[in-house]
């Protein structure tokens, strides 16, 4: 797992990351990752209910609840780190 994490740090552009994810994941897995990321952004940046997010995205409420738990309660804070860093990058421009 550690080696995979290091490999995921190697792309220097979004295009390079897209190529790596395309090689590494099935199309369904990439869609699932993209859906979870979209849900995390919606949960962080809006006051939509889980039902409204489900209606807007088609993502299951089970997945929405899981993303919300990892975004707000779990100690890993991977979603939070990525969201905050993207905001910092945007502010720096």
Label each PLM-derived region with a short phrase.
Residues 63, 74-79:
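Winged helix-turn-helix DNA-binding recognition segment
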Residues 51-58, 64:
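Short alpha-helical "recognition helix" segments of helix-turn-helix
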Residues 68-71:
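DNA major-groove recognition helix of helix-turn-helix
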Residues 1-11:
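General nucleic-acid-binding
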Residues 46-52, 76:
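Short helix-capping/linker segments at secondary-structure and domain boundaries
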Residues 33-48:
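Short, amphipathic alpha-helical "recognition" segments used to contact nucleic acids or chromatin
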Residues 17-36:
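Short, Lys/Arg-enriched anionic-surface-contact patches
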Residues 77-93:
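Intrinsically disordered, low-complexity basic tails/linkers immediately adjacent to helix-turn-helix/homeobox/MYB/SANT
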């Amino acid at each position: 797992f550690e080696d995979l994490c290091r490999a995921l740090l190697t792309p220097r552009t979004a295009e390079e990351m897209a190529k790596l994810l395309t090689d590494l994941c099935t199309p369904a897995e990439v869609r699932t990752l993209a859906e979870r990321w979209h849900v995390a952004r919606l949960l962080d940046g809006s006051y939509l209910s889980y039902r409204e997010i489900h209606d807007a995205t088609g993502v299951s409420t089970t997945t929405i609840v899981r993303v919300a738990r990892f975004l707000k309660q779990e100690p890993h804070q991977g979603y939070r780190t990525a969201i905050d860093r993207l905001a910092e990058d945007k502010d720096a421009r």
